Structures are given as structure tokens and as C-alpha cells.
Amino acid sequence: MPLFLEAGATVITRKGCVQSPLLWGLALCADLVLANTVVEARAVRALSGARVPVLWWLHDAFAGYPHIAHQIPRELGENIRLYSVGSHAANAMHSVRPEFNIRPLIYGLPDYAAEKFSHYDLSYAGGRPLFATVGSFENRKGQDIFCKAIRLLPPETMKKASFLFVGKAAEAEMMDAVRSLTADCPDNVFYVKRLTRDEIKSLMAQCTCLVCASRDDPMPTFVTEGLIFGKPAIVSEHTGTAGLITEGVDGFVYEDDDPEKLAERLAWAIEHPEKLAAMRPACRELYESHYSKQAFFRQFTTGRKGAYRRISSPFFITLPKLRTKKFGGCSTNTPPDCDILS
């Protein structure tokens, strides 16, 4: 949303917009409706064939589709365009609607490396190369795979590195795997429940490599944040990032959710920290070419035709005082609790 605001758009947000006829009126008067994630399937179905262009932006993992597939329309009007944050999110939709045409539109992140932020003290890592993972502890995120891979490392190799798990425990099984590992390896395996935004940025600036062992992850944000600081990542093939990595140039991909294959990549990285450091320019280039705000703008505008190139006020809808404002030539009463950002 900040990118739309910076471009001079008027943005309306509303949590329950599909339940209000007045808010539907706002949508039909907009220059663009952005339906964010597959959860908006019912709204997309209702707007299919309307005169307003709709950008349906998919960020979703495979895990959610069995619960919502019945709501996804089987055909889309010409006003509906599908985009996804990467090949993984597109493949998830194709698992239930293989005929849909889905274009790439990867989110853009600010250049955190150019910002000032407070320093996060990582002295507990002992000055060793630090391999970190960030995310809620759940089966889909695969912390247990990372734990098994660490245990598979040769003892002498493992002692040369430190490992950090950051995240809240959503599933006990994942948390148990991490707690067991930190108990067995207290000198170089660490767990932190939560870090502030500044602490995350500082972690990305200081760590050696990120590890994403997810079983199902459309586009892990912490991996992208690492790229901003020129840090490579070892990622599962079941992530959106895997489709953009050039093996050994700006990251590494392992297959089959296999801890042994992850351990192989980890062992090489631990033994060759200087080669990881040499990957920094390529990692930064990957961020600039695919994940920067400028890259998002290029993707958003390239190839758009007609109304997609004339967007002036995309709308999201939220709900406070009744007021009147003109939208795209329509004079509309703004419903209670509706936030207008411009």
C-alpha cells in the first residue's frame, strides 16, 4: 500500500468490504480493485465481468487451498488479472485451477540497508559464522528439518558455526525440536522468541547466511531482507525464492525436504565463509532486480494495457463518520469506519 500512496493514489481499506452495498459502490467507482490473496475469491467472483479492473494478487501456500477451493471461480471475466509473488504461489493456484493465466508480481521491500537502526548484540554467537532462520514455528516452516540437518553435521564442522532460531511457537512439535537442539548444543545453537524491526535489520546485517527450510512457503520475507544486506540463503525447493536463485551465485537450493541435502549445503557453507562473503554483490543484485520498490514498479507497469496503465486511485476499504467524497467521477457516501488514505 505505501507504494500506491507514494505514487499519489487514493487508497481505501476496509476489512469487511464485501458485506456492504455502499462499499461495493466504491469498488465499482474505483480505477482499480486489488484483491489481496486467494481469501478474496468470493469478492473476485462477484466482480468478475464488471467494468472495474481487478488485480487478484496471490501470496498463498498450498496448505490453504483445500479449505477455499470451492469458492474460487472456474472462469474469470476479462477484467480480472491474476498475479502471484512467485512460481510457488502460482503453482498453488494451478493445483486447483490449472487453466488460469498467472503473471509474476513480486512484492517490493524498502532498502533497509540504507536506513539507520540500532545495533543488536550478537556476541552470544561467539564470533562464529552465524546461520539464522526467522518465522513462526509450524510444520509448514520446517524448523524440524533445519534441526535435523544441524545434527547431521560432522562434529568438527558444527563447532565452527552458530545457529539462531527466531520465532513464536505456533506448533509444539516444531518448538520441541528446537528446544531439544538448544539443550544438546547450548554453546552454538540459540533461540529468540521475538526481535524488533531494528533488531531484525541488525541481524541481517551481521549474519553470515539465512536458512529457510520451509515445506510450503510462497516467498519468505526474511530471506528477501537478507538479500537487501547482500546475504545468501540456503532455501528449500518449496519456496518462491528457489525459482529466482542461481545456484552457488546468489544462494543455494536443496531438494525433497531432505535434512541430509540441507546438511550438505550447510557443511559447505560453514567450511567456506569467504566464498559466502564473495556472493554479497550477486545477492544484492538479486534484491535490486526482483524485490526492490523499483523492481515492483517495473513489474506492475510493464505490459499493462488500457485501464491498467491509467490507474489513479486504487481502493481498499476500511470502516468512521459518514462523509461524501468523489471517486473517479462518482459521488459516494463514505460508510462509517472507512479510512481514506491519500
Walk through the language-model features, giving the residues of each.
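Short, structured helix-loop element that forms part of the nucleotide-activated donor/catalytic region
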Residues: P2-L5, S162-D187, E199
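Short alpha-helical donor nucleotide-sugar binding micro-motif in glycosyltransferases
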Residues: L26-A27, R194-L195, S202-C207
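A short, active-site helix/loop in glycosyltransferases that binds the activated sugar's phosphate group
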Residues: A43, P66, E78-I102, L109
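Conserved donor-binding/catalytic core segment of Leloir-type glycosyltransferases
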Residues: Y83, S123-K141, C147-I150, L164
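Aromatic "clamp/platform" in nucleotide-sugar-dependent glycosyltransferases that forms part
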Residues: R215
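Short hydrophobic beta-strand element within catalytic cores of glycosyltransferases
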Residues: P232-V235
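Conserved acidic donor-binding segment of nucleotide-sugar-dependent glycosyltransferases
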Residues: E247-G248, F252-D258, W268-P273
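A short, well-ordered alpha-helix in the C-terminal region of glycosyltransferases
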Residues: K261, W268, K275-H290
